Amino acid sequence: MRILGIDPGLRLTGFGLIEQTGQKLAYVASGVVKSGEGSLPARLGILFGGINEVIATYRPDTCAVEIVFVNVNPQSTLLLGQARGAAICAAVSNDLTVAEYTALQIKQAVVGHGKAAKTQVQEMVKRLLALPIAPTADAADALACAITHAHGSRLGAQSTAGYRLKGGRLV
């Protein structure tokens, strides 16, 4: 199964794809979609188009997206939520199911504790996928999200327990 992980952001949205065969995970691709400058609708359109392009290129079977945390600045949280929405819409418009995980769940599944630093996540992603170098922070977070989904860890499994599929999305 090919899993697309997404770390949403308005300026940079990280993506990471892994292939799961039984217990084995293999790296497929990772990177970022840059929205650049301009109006909010234009930037969201770039993110939507970029994720669509990733999906068309790599043909994932499912998608895992990091849940937005509530920031100190409410405006930043709203903007991040809109970027996340654009990414989810791209996945759903391509008939992918979307699982959602908190940063705590992702760090717990990949590093072993929920308060891990970004560098720890990068290093564990590098090790788990046998990469020669650690991916960038945004790509590593996206790959970690995909790894969390692949592991179906106890924390990850709880995030979808009791939900049903509606329009390609867990509700």
Curated annotation (Swiss-Prot):
Gene behind this protein: ruvC
GO CC term (a single one): Holliday junction resolvase complex
Coarse class of the protein's main subcellular location: cytoplasm
Protein name, as recorded: Crossover junction endodeoxyribonuclease RuvC
A Pfam cross-reference name: RuvC
CDD domains associated with the record: RuvC
Subcellular localization, as worded in the UniProt entry: Cytoplasm
Annotated PANTHER family: CROSSOVER JUNCTION ENDODEOXYRIBONUCLEASE RUVC
Family per similarity comment: Belongs to the RuvC family.
Cofactor note: Binds 2 Mg(2+) ion per subunit.
Residues the record lists as binding Mg(2+) 2: E66
Function: The RuvA-RuvB-RuvC complex processes Holliday junction (HJ) DNA during genetic recombination and DNA repair. Endonuclease that resolves HJ intermediates. Cleaves cruciform DNA by making single-stranded nicks across the HJ at symmetrical positions within the homologous arms, yielding a 5'-phosphate and a 3'-hydroxyl group; requires a central core of homology in the junction. The consensus cleavage sequence is 5'-(A/T)TT(C/G)-3'. Cleavage occurs on the 3'-side of the TT dinucleotide at the point of strand exchange.
Record GO terms (molecular function): crossover junction DNA endonuclease activity; DNA binding; magnesium ion binding
Organism: Thiobacillus denitrificans (strain ATCC 25259 / T1)
Residue ranges of the TM segments: none
Keyword annotations of the record: Cytoplasm, DNA damage, DNA recombination, DNA repair, DNA-binding, Endonuclease, Hydrolase, Magnesium, Metal-binding, Nuclease
Needed cofactors: Mg(2+)
Active site per database record: D7, E66, D138
Binding partners and assembly: Homodimer which binds Holliday junction (HJ) DNA. The HJ becomes 2-fold symmetrical on binding to RuvC with unstacked arms; it has a different conformation from HJ DNA in complex with RuvA. In the full resolvosome a probable DNA-RuvA(4)-RuvB(12)-RuvC(2) complex forms which resolves the HJ.
Residues holding Mg(2+) 1: D7, D138
Catalytic activity: Endonucleolytic cleavage at a junction such as a reciprocal single-stranded crossover between two homologous DNA duplexes (Holliday junction)
One of the GO BP terms on file: DNA recombination
InterPro entries in the cross-refs: RNaseH-like_sf, RNaseH_sf, X-over_junc_endoDNase_Mg_BS, X-over_junc_endoDNase_RuvC
Enzyme Commission number(s) from the entry: 3.1.21.10
